[in-house]
Amino acid sequence: PLLDEIDTAARDLHSVNTVRFADGKATGFNTDILGFAESLNRDGVSLQGKKVLLLGYGGAASVMAYHCVTQGAYLTITGRNLEKAEALQKQLTDAVPGARISVFSRRHIPRDIHIVLNSTPVGMYPKENAAPLHYLPHKTEYVFDAIYNPPVTSTMKLANPRKTKTRDGLFMLVMQAAHAQTIWTGVTFEPQACETILRRTYGKMAVKRLHEKYGKKNLVLCGFMGSG
């Protein structure tokens, strides 16, 4: 009731995070889905025909799930509360005709999953040793975790021994903000500018973690030029 217009994704998701006021109209958008899509594109990940496991059923989950089903993926949703998972399933099947979505308990996750998406806060700092999963389905090719602190999450660590490609949620966060700025100002951010923001943010996070672990002590860095 507070908006004059709303874009398709925001309408289907029942979620607006950006409002543009122009020509006497208020228009609502959801840029989270754009940030998520760009994260996958950055890693060369195609969803068409892939079997995707989604952990969680909240706001971030709905964004990931919507993009998956609109791109032709077979989606499996799991979580502690299956009723909430089924509610997300219904919302998506109502919004996207032909969406292929199933709901399973964590004990009965299909083994032929290609992509694992974590939308839950499980594993976020400071409880970074907690994990929403204790193993990855054996066909997993890619792991995306919406958490960005720590930059390598407990879910992502499951992929490390297998050399499975992973991505944390910081790029999604940066890109959804960049798209919001474009909607408001018409200015498009160059990819290099976004990469610079990423590097600086990771650096600040690393320094903060060192301070928390060791206190503000003098550190001596040894190594190749620029590596420190």
Label for each model-derived stretch:
Residues 81, 108-130, 144:
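Rossmann-like NAD(P)-binding element
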Residues 28-30, 40, 49-69, 79-80, ...:
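Glycine-rich adenosine-cofactor-binding loop
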Residues 1-45, 150-152, 156-158, 162-165:
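Phosphate/diphosphate ligand-binding glycine-rich loop within oxidoreductases
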Residues 123-143, 153-154, 158:
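Rossmann-fold NAD(P) dinucleotide-binding segment
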Residues 71-95:
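NAD(P)-binding Rossmann-fold cofactor-contacting core
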Residues 214-228:
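Walker A (P-loop) phosphate-binding motif
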Residues 97-113:
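Short acidic low-complexity segments
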Residues 21, 141-191:
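Rossmann-fold NAD(P)-binding glycine/threonine-rich loop
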